[in-house]
UniProtKB/Swiss-Prot annotation:
Cytoplasmic side stretches: 1-31
Bilayer topology: Single-pass membrane protein
Source taxon at top rank: Archaea
Pfam families in the record: Sec61_beta
Gene Ontology biological process terms from the UniProt entry: protein transport
Annotated InterPro entries: Preprot_translocase_SecG, SecG/Sec61-beta/Sbh
Keywords, sorted A to Z: Cell membrane, Membrane, Protein transport, Translocation, Transmembrane, Transmembrane helix, Transport
Summary of subunit composition and partner proteins: Component of the protein translocase complex. Heterotrimer consisting of alpha (SecY), beta (SecG) and gamma (SecE) subunits. Can form oligomers of the heterotrimer.
Family: Belongs to the SEC61-beta family.
Record's protein name: Preprotein translocase subunit SecG
Known role: Involved in protein export. The function of the beta subunit is unknown, but it may be involved in stabilization of the trimeric complex.
Topological domains, Extracellular: 54-57
Length: 57
C-alpha cells in the first residue's frame, strides 16, 4: 500500500495561501461591470472628442 505523506510541505503552502487571502481583504473591490462600463465610457468620450475636434488621424 502507499504510505501517507506527512503535512510538511502542505502546511507551508497553506500558510502562504492564508497570507494571500488575508492581504486580499484590504484591496480595492471593483465590480467587473463597472470596469467594462468605464472602458465603454472612455471609448465613447474619445470618439466624441474625435468628432468634435478632429484630433485623431
Amino acid at each position: 500500500m502507499a504510505k501517507k505523506k506527512g503535512e510538511g510541505p502542505g502546511l507551508m503552502s497553506s500558510a502562504g495561501l492564508m497570507r494571500y487571502f488575508e492581504s486580499e481583504e484590504t484591496s480595492i473591490k471593483l465590480d467587473p461591470k463597472m470596469v467594462i462600463g468605464a472602458g465603454i465610457a472612455s471609448g465613447v468620450a474619445i470618439m466624441a472628442l474625435n468628432i468634435t475636434f478632429g484630433l485623431w488621424p
